[in-house]
Amino acid sequence: MKNNYTSLKSPLDEEDELKTDHEIDLEKGPLPEYDSEEESTLPPYSDHALVNNPPNTHRENHSYGTTDNSSPLLIILLISFTSIILFNAPEVCYLKYKDAFFKNYGAAEWTLFGFWCLVCTLALIFLTYFYETWTKAVKVTVISLAKCVKVTAIFLAQCVKACGKGIKHFLKKWENMPMAFSEVFLFNILVGSPRMNLRYIFGDRWGLKCSLADHIIFVVLSILVFIAETVKPGSIRVNLIRKMGYEAKQQVNEYTAVPLREMNSESEA
């Protein structure tokens, strides 16, 4: 069978391809003449040259601006030694307080002191060798504690704010609630105490006995007093107290306003 395949490209497209193949890349410039046997004379932008000599762009980009962040050895030793001193300061202060620091030391005390110095020396070496590790751990711990303190403070502030709003709303809606509690308290003092005394003194004569019904009746009366005061916000007693306060305030204002009027009249005269 004959292949009847015909190219879809037009003659104009084929001429454009031939032109582009023979055109010179203006960015790279003309290709230099080189010997195919010598590898060193390959053009710099050929594929073979790129494989043999990969660009060091990543290394060159990161070669500038790099600084050595390692701390000097003297500073590391100073920080490690300071941390050991702070760790041993409470023990030294305690021995000074007991007046037992380098005083009447025996073999056991000097042995313990030598072991203590050995431990401090090993700790200094350890802290110096693992300086970056333990400093990072300390930083992370301090940051975590600061965040915990911040979250706790915010939580407590929100709790206090919510409690304040709740108390304010409670007092606004049930403004006579404190008066109800005070009335129940006074009722228990004025009625409960004489009741117990009368039962103790005249119990045998009048036949008064401590029964469950007596306690239930007293509790029910206390609850009724509380309900009678809180069933309607702004009871007569609360309104009476407000009225007395308002009248007292007006009297004070009147007493203070009279001398001012007299002083103004005298100054005008």
From Swiss-Prot:
Stretches with biased composition (Basic and acidic residues): 19-30
Keyword Chaperone annotated: no
Any one GO CC term of the record: cytoplasm
GO biological process, one term: meiotic drive
Listed InterPro entries: WTF (IPR004982)
Compartments (UniProt record): Spore membrane; Vacuole membrane
Nucleotide-binding listed as a keyword: no
Transmembrane segments: 73-95, 110-132, 206-228
Keywords for the protein's UniProt record, in alphabetical order: Membrane, Transmembrane, Transmembrane helix, Vacuole
Bilayer topology annotation: Multi-pass membrane protein
Region named Disordered: 1-65
Main location: membrane
The protein's role, per its UniProt record: Acts as a suppressor component of the dual wtf meiotic drive system, and can suppress but not confer meiotic drive by compatible poisons. Wtf meiotic drive systems promote unequal transmission of alleles from the parental zygote to progeny spores by encoding a poison and an antidote from the same locus; the poison is trans-acting and forms toxic aggregates in all spores within an ascus, wherease the antidote is spore-specific and targets aggregates for degradation by the vacuole.
Subunit structure: Homomer. Interacts with other proteins that exhibit high sequence similarity.
Family per similarity comment: Belongs to the WTF family.
Protein name stated in the entry: Meiotic drive suppressor wtf5
Source organism of the structure: Schizosaccharomyces pombe (strain 972 / ATCC 24843)
